[in-house]
Amino acid sequence: MRQLAMTAAMLVLSITAAAQENETMIVRLAEIEVYPQYLKEYLDYANEVDRLSVEREPGVVCLYPMQSAEDSTKIRILEIYASEEAYQQHLKTDPFQKYKQGTLHMVKDLKLPTMKPLDPETMKLIFKKQR
């Protein structure tokens, strides 16, 4: 779990840093807990909306779902949008509305903290290593 959290944090910070010129970028790490009896169904909804959003929406930079290794009902989704406008547009799409309405009763807890990079200069190095 610690490695998963570190990887997610580094990804959030590095992508945010790479887009430093775009001060309006929105980065969130959704923290979701799902009722166990709905887990499989929830994961199906989440995977569909994440895939369709990244494929179809230019303003959706990243939707990266992860599942806790210790507790499979705990889901984290790294969300990165090009701007507040892109985020607001995403909320209005059919795939997101289907996900949101279809999973309301499945979600035990939801937090959507907005993230910001701790050290944008150092995080830029991650992209250089990936090339």
What are the roles of these predicted feature ranges?
Residues E21, L52-C62, I80-M115:
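An amphipathic, aromatic/His-enriched active-site/gating alpha helix that lines ligand/cofactor pockets
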Residues I26-R56:
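N-terminal targeting signals for Sec/Tat export/insertion, comprising classic cleavable signal peptides
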Residues L11, A46-V49, D94, T103-M106, ...:
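Alpha-helix boundary/capping residues
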Residues L4-A5, Q20-V27, Y64-D71, K100-R131:
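Glycine-rich beta-strand-turn "strand-cap" elements at beta-sheet edges
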Residues M25-E33, C62-L91, K129:
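Short, well-ordered beta-strand segments in beta-rich or mixed alpha/beta enzyme
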Residues M10-A18:
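Hydrophobic h-region of N-terminal signal peptides that target proteins for export
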Residues A5, A17, D94-F96:
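Glycine-rich, phosphate-binding/catalytic loops in enzymes
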